[in-house]
């Protein structure tokens, strides 16, 4: 496997978007407030019946090909993992970009965001995601970032477990983050990797 780092471009995003990001939702993390939060917060996993497929690229206005329309990507980097010249995984990191709500952490410029990560279903659980994550963290550290921030949802339990294995810790839980009807039931989970 070979991982290359490139600036974001329309041509590359078209190729990148062909790597599926969809996953089957088999369980979700339930947020339980103990004593309305004063006694703590607990997460527990609950099976989802029936299971369903979630595809971030199918959400209106989302998907890699739209990023150039929405953001100045000059401080972004795109990582592509290839096997025999075929893209099988990718990751995108955003840095110093006005309009990216996740980078508005008090106006700090020492935080980078793992904006997108995807591995082709036939190549998952082979270490590609870990290799991509490592490259993203290295890139952020080279830019003197203190933290790498990652957003997931409570319905993407495999991603939550993946980020914990990479050394991330849960920093934020927002039960009211999403208002669009198709995702209003989801909880935003923000993970942080300490790069210091």
Question: Where are these predicted regions, by residue range?
Answer:
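Short polar catalytic/cofactor-binding loops
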Residues: 7-13
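Conserved acetyl-CoA-binding loop-helix of GNAT-fold acetyltransferases
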Residues: 119, 125-138, 142, 161-165
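Short alpha-helical
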Residues: 11, 157-158
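Conserved GNAT acetyl-CoA-binding A-motif
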Residues: 140-152
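Acetyl-CoA-dependent GNAT
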Residues: 18, 22-30, 34-111, 115-116, ...
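Structural preference for beta-strand elements that scaffold enzyme active sites
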Residues: 111, 147-149, 190
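C-terminal "cap" of GNAT-fold acetyltransferases
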Residues: 2, 106, 153-157, 166-172, ...
């Amino acid at each position: 496997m070979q991982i290359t780092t490139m600036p974001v471009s329309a041509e590359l995003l078209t190729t990148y978007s062909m790597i599926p990001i969809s996953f089957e939702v088999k369980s979700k993390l339930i947020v339980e407030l103990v004593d309305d939060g004063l006694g703590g917060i607990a997460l527990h996993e609950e099976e989802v019946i029936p299971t369903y497929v979630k595809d971030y690229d199918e959400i209106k206005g989302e998907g890699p090909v739209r990023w150039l329309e929405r953001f100045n990507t000059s401080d972004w980097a795109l990582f592509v993992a290839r096997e025999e010249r075929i893209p099988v995984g990718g990751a995108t990191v955003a840095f110093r970009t006005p309009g990216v709500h996740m980078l508005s952490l008090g106006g700090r410029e020492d935080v980078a965001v793992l904006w997108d990560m995807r591995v082709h279903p036939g190549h998952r659980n082979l270490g590609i995601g870990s290799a991509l994550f490592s490259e993203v963290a290295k890139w952020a550290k080279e830019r003197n970032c203190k933290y790498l921030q990652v957003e997931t949802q409570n319905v993407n339990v495999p991603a939550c477990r993946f980020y914990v294995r990479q050394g991330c810790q849960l920093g934020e839980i927002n039960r009211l983050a999403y208002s669009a009807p198709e995702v209003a039931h989801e909880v935003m989970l923000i993970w942080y990797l300490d790069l210091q």
